[in-house]
Amino acid sequence: MPENTIPEITSALSQLGKPPQLRNVGTPSTVELQEHATLLAAATSDNTRRAYRSAIQHFLAWGGALPADEPAIIHYLLAHAAALNPRTLALRLTALSQWHVHQGFPDPASLPTVRKTLTGISRVHGKPKKKAKALPVEDLERIIVALEQFDTVKAKRDSALLQIGFFGGFRRSEVASLEVEFIKWQAEGIAITLPRSKTDQEGEGIVKAIPYGDDVCCPATALRTWLAAAGITSGPIFRRVDKWGKIGADALHESSVNTILAECARRAQLDYVPELSSHSLRRGMATSAHRAGADFRDIKRQGGWRHDGTVQGYIEEASQFEENAAGSLLRRNSNNK
């Protein structure tokens, strides 16, 4: 190397200064720990966290202690095997497992003997899952006609809520949390943007379009009527209305959707009110849309379902008497005449 280049290199190195002081990567700061805890919590939905919290409280109220061991969890399962649905026990077992994992303890809930115990309980005590009855669009129309007899703000709210929930294929948590800012009024109807949903936990946003109706039901018109009557221009759309007609400022609790549907169904004199729940609106949209000739893909998109199997189950329910092997046999003679 030429001697005259050495001073240049020395000068360049001196200009680099001292290397930055690096913190030990294995010791996160308090702020980072808090941020990490927030991100971990955000990875689980609010409903799931509430369910897990309830499960842990049930285990502790029974007499369990945390951290738990294998015999205690098996004892807990056996104590509730006959009284609780196996699906409920499975959820509580998952909650116990998650608690131990996140607290840094060995997870006894995932041990083979515990899982086999739950499998045995499911086989001995398992029962078919109770499903909400689908609300046919014809019965929704009966409800809307019954509500039109009451010129009250509550009736207007209920009409808008049930129509938006049905034709939008919304979950009860989604329809209860809708805000005016989510609505875009267009010439063909309304477009509703959900900033987050059960199948969109990352918040990419889902848009559901509901066209104007030309018969008994018109969700967009019902919504506009309710908003005008309530004087709502921003914030939560569906709010509490007391017996004097006073409108609250906060959004309805999602459980209120069940109550509203049941009350309105009784007014319409439907004879299967005990079989209804908020999920009846989503199921009803899917089954009624299939009967009306809607495409599978369109039904799936409107309901925001992630899995084809869920939608296929609703379609099979809607056509159980149409595409029926027994029906073909029973009608064979009339078809030959």
Describe each PLM feature range.
Residues 45-62:
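Hotspots on structured nucleic-acid-binding interfaces, especially in canonical RNA/DNA-binding domains
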